[in-house]
UniProtKB/Swiss-Prot annotation:
GO terms for biological process: export across plasma membrane; pyridoxal transmembrane transport; pyridoxamine transmembrane transport; pyridoxine transmembrane transport; transmembrane transport; xenobiotic transport. It is found in: Endoplasmic reticulum; Golgi apparatus; Membrane. PROSITE patterns: MFS, SUGAR_TRANSPORT_1. The chain crosses the membrane at residues 90-110, 133-153, 156-176, 180-200, 213-233, 243-263, 313-333, 348-368, 393-413, 422-442, 457-477, 492-512. Residues 10-56 are annotated as: Disordered. It is a multi-pass membrane protein. It holds the Pfam family MFS_1. One of its GO terms (cellular component) is plasma membrane. GO terms for molecular function: pyridoxal transmembrane transporter activity; pyridoxamine transmembrane transporter activity; pyridoxine transmembrane transporter activity; transmembrane transporter activity. This is Uncharacterized transporter C965.13.
Length: 537
């Protein structure tokens, strides 16, 4: 039984002529005469896809596109999984450092807030809108860019959004009031968000399920590295702060060239190009070729991520969890200056350099990935060769405790009476716990929604960044009205409640996936494995 038939059979879709299905030969699995829409989907029924219907779009809608995307065979010779290692590493490296470049703006700007207050006569809360609206842009941008990359391809979404990101650096560099700065920061954040949703998707495109943990760890490393080095960069350019945005334009131009040089990673685009050369006919190629209508594609792009967020309990739960976790990190970062400048009498550059403990922490997370990958393969063997998405959390069952532990450690050793080294190391512990959780969640989502990963990650990102944007402003109130010790301790107590979520997903995630329309169920994975559709370890 093919993977499409397996998936469809668990979403009220009956396969046709299964007994007569030809053996796998390395080609795309599903042929046109094997697709029949169930009564549940009769409103857009298309039992056959003849060449006469090639130009028609009446029978193709956003759900048809989603099903076609989910039917891609990972063993197809044109699939990026078959690329040589050097090609995969080149693409992964370019996109990882693209993410570093975009994310550093989220923390670099905090050094300029007192300049905004002095020049534009605003309060500190208002000046923080530049940061929080950039994060809001990061939240909503993927809701459009993620689904666009799932249907039009990753490469040109990167290039187009990056060019627009560069353009909106100009009004920030020339800003003459705070509204101009904040609004353009939000727009730039939206276009730059392709480095969030789409980089993770690209890693899933090129790496197999057994090695994708490494690719996603690079994605997580890029996000945390960018946030870590952004603040020192901003401090270094403090006296010439407008040059930060001119520098962003120069560096961005370099990345545009690299993105143009990178090959397309979306499997369906590669397979369609292969099919146009060889004349191969498959269901997914026919469906996607028919979907030339701008209306159909626009419906897919605009509806898919929101549909996933509103109807998929996995994405909703993990998105809300990560929103609080990500927000707690911004609250923690709000506390670094009161701790290291006020309590330890460091200079501002010294305090900014303490952000680098997160860079050390996330580098340790990358180094832990061989252990997590071994545990993942061990769990797969233990379950008869069937991979469980929940196995992505195995190492996180331990490291999740680093989150509250790091916050408690920081809280009660940061009052200035104990060496500054202690809270610095505590921040490093937090820098291991938080990125490892994010890594596990991204892996889990991409395993559960493999061929609409861009849309799934976009849906996951929205609540994550929206909540974080609100908590940025809450941090100012907390540290103005509480001591640094009890402000940090409050964050630590809140983080304890988040630990349970990881255990719930690990032990009960397979039950949640059973009630999903798009997530791959464990039974579907088992049947696909039995049919030898999925690659062996």
């Amino acid at each position: 039984m093919s993977i499409l038939n397996v998936i469809r059979s668990h979403h009220d879709v009956e396969p046709q002529n299964v007994e007569e299905e030809p053996p796998l030969t390395g080609q795309t699995i599903v042929t046109e005469d094997k697709l029949e829409t169930s009564a549940k989907d009769k409103k857009h029924e298309s039992p056959s896809m003849s060449e006469d219907e090639e130009g028609s779009v009446e029978n193709v809608d956003a759900w048809d596109l989603t099903k076609a995307l989910m039917s891609i065979d990972p063993n197809h010779p044109a699939h990026p999984h078959k690329w040589p290692l050097w090609k995969k590493l080149f693409v992964a490296t370019v996109y990882t450092f693209l993410e570093v470049y975009v994310i550093w703006s989220s923390t670099a700007c905090i050094n300029f807030f007192d300049i905004y207050q002095t020049n534009w006569h605003c309060s500190i809360q208002v000046s923080y809108l530049v940061q929080s609206l950039f994060i809001v842009g990061n939240a909503f941008g993927p809701m459009l860019l993620g689904p666009m990359s799932d249907i039009f391809g990753r490469k040109w979404v990167y290039v187009g959004s990056l060019i627009l990101y560069i353009i909106f650096q100009i009004p920030q560099a020339l800003a003459y009031n705070l509204p101009m700065m904040a609004i353009n920061s939000a727009i730039a954040g939206a276009f730059g968000s392709s480095a969030l949703a789409n980089v993770a998707s690209s890693m899933c495109d090129i790496f197999t399920p057994e090695t994708v943990g490494f690719g996603i760890s690079l994605f997580v490393w890029g996000a945390n590295a960018g946030a870590s080095i952004g603040s020192p960069i901003g401090e270094a350019l403090y006296d010439h702060w407008r040059w930060f945005y001119w520098m962003n334009m120069i560096v961005g131009g370099f990345f545009v060239i690299l993105c143009v040089l990178c090959p397309e990673t979306l499997p369906v685009i590669n397979i369609m190009n292969y099919s146009s050369t060889t004349g191969e006919k498959t269901v997914q190629v026919s469906t996607l070729a028919k979907a030339k209508s701008a209306v159909v594609r626009t419906k897919f792009v605009l509806s898919t991520a929101f549909k996933l967020l509103c109807t998929e309990p996995i994405i909703m739960a993990l998105g809300l969890y990560n929103g609080f976790a990500y927000g707690l990190i911004f609250l923690y970062l709000d506390g670094l200056f009161p701790v290291f400048v006020d309590n330890y009498k460091m200079g501002y550059m010294g305090a900014n350099l303490t952000y680098l403990n997160f860079l050390v922490g996330v580098t340790i997370v990358v180094m832990l990935q061989p252990i997590q990958n071994w545990l993942y393969r061990w769990d797969k063997r233990r379950h008869g060769g069937v991979a469980r998405p929940e196995a992505r959390f195995l190492i996180s069952l331990l490291t999740v405790w680093f989150f509250p532990a790091g916050l408690f450690w920081f809280a009660f050793t940061s009052d200035g009476r104990i060496s500054w080294v202690s809270p610095l190391i505590a921040g490093g512990v937090l820098g291991v716990g938080d990125p490892q959780l994010w890594l596990a969640m991204i892996n889990y989502i991409t395993d559960s929604y493999p061929s609409v990963a861009g849309s799934a990650i976009a849906a996951f990102t929205l609540p994550s960044f929206a909540i974080a944007a609100v908590l940025v402003h809450l941090g100012i109130i907390m540290f103005d009205n509480m001591t640094t010790t009890w402000a940090m301790a409050t964050l630590a107590f809140i983080s304890l409640s988040l630990v349970a979520t990881i255990y719930v997903i690990y032990f009960f995630g397979h039950l949640i996936r059973k009630h999903s329309r798009l997530a791959v169920t464990q039974q579907a994975l088992q049947e696909a494995h039995d049919a030898k559709v999925l690659p062996e370890v």
